[in-house]
Amino acid sequence: MSVLTQVLALLLLWLTGARCDIQMTQSPASLSASVGETVTITCRASGNIHNYLAWYQQKQGKSPQLLVYNAKTLADGVPSRFSGSGSGTQYSLKINSLQPEDFGSYYCQHFWSTP
C-alpha cells in the first residue's frame, strides 16, 4: 500500500469518526401545554450540523414517527401546524394550535443521510 493510499485511508477513518463527536441537547426536558396553544421545542448541537437534523414524535408503546428532516422539510402526511427551523447549531420544532393527537414525546436527531 502506497503512502498516499495509507494517508487517504487514515483521513477517511478520521472523518468518519469525527461525525460521532456531535452532542445534541434538547430543551425543555419536559413541557406542559394545552390544546390550542403554540409549543416550541429547541435542539442545540455542539457543532455545525448543516441542517442534518430530524424531529420525531413518539407515543407510548409506539415507534417514533418522522415529522421533519433536513431541519425544515415536513415528512409526508405531517400536518402543516408542525414546522422546523434553524441552522448551524440551533434548531427548533414549532407546533401551532396544539391538537389532542399531538401529545407525546418529541426527539431531535442529528443524521448524516436522509432518514
From Swiss-Prot:
One of its GO terms (biological process) is adaptive immune response. SMART domains: IG (SM00409), IGv (SM00406). Residues 70-76 are annotated as: Complementarity-determining-2. The keyword Disulfide bond applies. It comes from the Eukaryota. Residues 77-108 are annotated as: Framework-3. InterPro entries: Ig-like_dom, Ig-like_dom_sf, Ig-like_fold, Ig_sub, Ig_V-set, IgV_Light_Chain. Residues 44-54 are annotated as: Complementarity-determining-1. Keywords: Adaptive immunity, Disulfide bond, Immunity, Immunoglobulin, Signal. One of its GO terms (cellular component) is immunoglobulin complex. Pfam families: V-set. Residues 1-20 form the signal peptide. Residues 21-43 are annotated as: Framework-1. Residues 109-115 are annotated as: Complementarity-determining-3. The gene was isolated and sequenced separately from two different sources, embryos and cultured plasmacytoma cells that secrete the similar kappa chain MOPC 149. This is Immunoglobulin kappa chain variable 12-41. It comes from Mus musculus (Mouse).
